Curated annotation (Swiss-Prot):
GO cellular component: cytosol
Protein name: SsrA-binding protein
Species of the source: Parvibaculum lavamentivorans (strain DS-1 / DSM 13023 / NCIMB 13966)
PROSITE patterns with a match to the protein in the record: SSRP (PS01317)
Biological processes per GO annotation: trans-translation
Gene (UniProt): smpB
Pfam families: SmpB
PANTHER family reported in the protein's UniProt record: SSRA-BINDING PROTEIN, TMRNA-BINDING COMPONENT OF TRANS-TRANSLATION TAGGING COMPLEX
């Protein structure tokens, strides 16, 4: 009957427990196609993520020459109870994708100059950690300003509706 405090942040509508959400990526990039990838983690990393900590800020994914996709610069804090068996906080982690998906990502990055960015990290119903990655094109400064204007207008519109209604 007791619930654990400090766990994963929130539960999405489809039963996912979201660990980390990269909100800056949606602002700085226009996201095209998205993929769901598994991630190769050590035990202490999974334990640390279960506490709801972790960050995808400044993280990116890259396709290596050997045909693997690596998640670089994602922050998973150390797990205090793991003491000597702990992990590095910002080590490169392998993302698990199908071969066709990897080829598609590599082609888009090479030919179209796109970037692969992690959008969110979450636990599935089965307790597996997944990372949602997206093919992204960098936004220009004018596009970012337009996004800010739209958000501001939506906020003002909602405020006006509350005052009138």
């Amino acid at each position: 009957m007791s619930s654990k405090s400090g766990g994963a942040k929130k539960k999405a509508g489809d039963g996912r427990k979201i660990i980390a959400d990269n909100r800056k990526a949606r602002f700085n990039y226009s996201i095209g196609e998205t993929f769901e990838a598994g991630i190769e983690l050590k035990g202490s990393e999974v334990k640390s993520l279960r506490t709801g900590q972790g960050s995808l800020n400044e993280a990116y994914a890259q396709v290596t020459r050997t045909g693997e996709v690596m998640l670089v610069n994602a922050y998973i804090p150390i797990y205090l109870q793991a003491n000597q068996f702990n992990h590095e906080t910002r080590r490169p982690r392998k993302l698990l994708l199908h071969k066709r998906e990897i080829e598609k990502l590599a082609a888009a990055v090479q030919r179209q100059g796109m970037t692969v960015v992690p959008l969110r990290m979450y636990f599935t119903d089965k307790g597996r950690v997944k990372v949602e990655i997206g093919l992204a094109q960098g936004k220009k400064l004018a596009d970012k300003r337009e996004t800010l204007k739209e958000r501001s207008w939506e906020r003002d519109k909602a405020r006006l509706m509350r005052e009138k209604g």
